[in-house]
């Protein structure tokens, strides 16, 4: 009679397999979680890190937690991902510096058994799930505010940002609205301010020099918009208004400031977003996949009219 192939397996391999099974079972517990995001100098990403750490410690009080800033450098973030995986992180929340460029690092992490949740922005490479604001909705809300304020006619600029899906979706959402209003003239839409205050100041300074008359500015996030506002002050320009995205503390303060050109911001909730991402990741570690691999969190437009009722980000 032919001996079954499994019986030919050496005893040492069978013993090794017996040792591996409990190890894999133990890995289903959240033991080491990490976040890598674009810029921990941005309060938005600080809240993502805080929300993730709080939820991770709710899931497992003994969890090891790491938060890193990629500074929007995909090569830096690639190294961070590889180092996190090699150090034993079994859950990584990824705020991609480049949604396409980070794909190889995501694939390596997945191959090593690490659960990867894209947070705030999408990422290629086979992430387990994506948790982010409805960024297209944010762009649509911002653009509709501009159209309504200008009665459908005016000259505007879009101050763009890094090549990540959240920014791309916001701009696409804004263009959805602007294209329905042919008397809205977009004078610039491709200048990358890096998602930062300093970048907004730099790009807007150049745009003000190139455009002697503007009616409105759509900045892809609040730090960019605040930088644009500073550029306007330095150039002694005040004929236009600015709309951002985030609902950040600085954005809310700008809405309350009489001297600011900042007028509206679709509000996100980075703390709650990160908590949801950790919750989803912890369940995936247990073998429970979410009903949808993309979870979109609605945004709400905050303006000068309702900012006093705005409670701000979850803390």
What are these regions (language model features)?
Residues 10-18, 22:
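Bacterial N-terminal signal peptides
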Residues 2-11:
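Bacterial N-terminal signal peptides that target proteins for export
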Residues 4, 24-315:
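A residue-level marker of the well-folded mature domains of exported/periplasmic proteins
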């Amino acid at each position: 009679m032919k001996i079954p192939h499994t019986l030919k397996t050496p005893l040492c391999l069978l013993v090794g397999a017996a040792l591996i099974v409990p190890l894999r079972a133990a890995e289903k517990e959240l033991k080491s979680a990490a976040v890598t995001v674009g810029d921990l100098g941005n309060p938005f990403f600080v809240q993502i890190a805080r929300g993730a750490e709080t939820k991770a410690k709710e899931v497992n009080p003994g969890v090891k937690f790491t938060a890193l800033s990629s500074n929007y450098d995909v090569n830096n973030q690639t190294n961070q991902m590889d180092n996190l995986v090699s150090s034993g992180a079994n859950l990584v929340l990824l705020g991609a510096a480049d949604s396409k460029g980070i794909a190889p690092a995501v694939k390596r992490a997945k191959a090593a058994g690490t659960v990867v949740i894209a947070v705030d922005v999408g990422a290629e490479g086979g992430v387990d799930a994506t948790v982010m604001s409805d960024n297209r909705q944010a762009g649509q809300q911002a653009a509709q505010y501009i159209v309504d304020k200008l009665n459908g006619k005016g000259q505007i600029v879009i101050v763009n940002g890094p090549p990540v899906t959240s920014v791309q979706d916001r701009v696409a959402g804004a263009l959805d609205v602007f294209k329905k209003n042919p008397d809205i003239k977009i004078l610039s839409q491709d200048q990358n301010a890096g998602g930062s205050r300093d970048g907004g100041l730099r790009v807007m300074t150049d745009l003000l020099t190139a455009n002697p008359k503007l009616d409105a500015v759509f900045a892809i996030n609040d730090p960019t918009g605040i930088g644009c506002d500073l550029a306007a002050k330095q150039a002694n320009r005040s004929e236009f208004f600015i709309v951002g995205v985030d609902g950040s503390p600085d954005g809310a303060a700008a809405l309350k400031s009489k001297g600011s050109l900042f007028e509206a911001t679709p509000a996100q909730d980075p703390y709650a977003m990160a908590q949801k991402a950790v919750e989803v990741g912890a369940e995936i570690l247990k073998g429970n996949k979410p009903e949808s691999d993309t979870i979109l969190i609605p945004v709400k437009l905050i303006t000068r009219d309702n900012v006093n009722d705005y409670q701000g980000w979850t803390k």
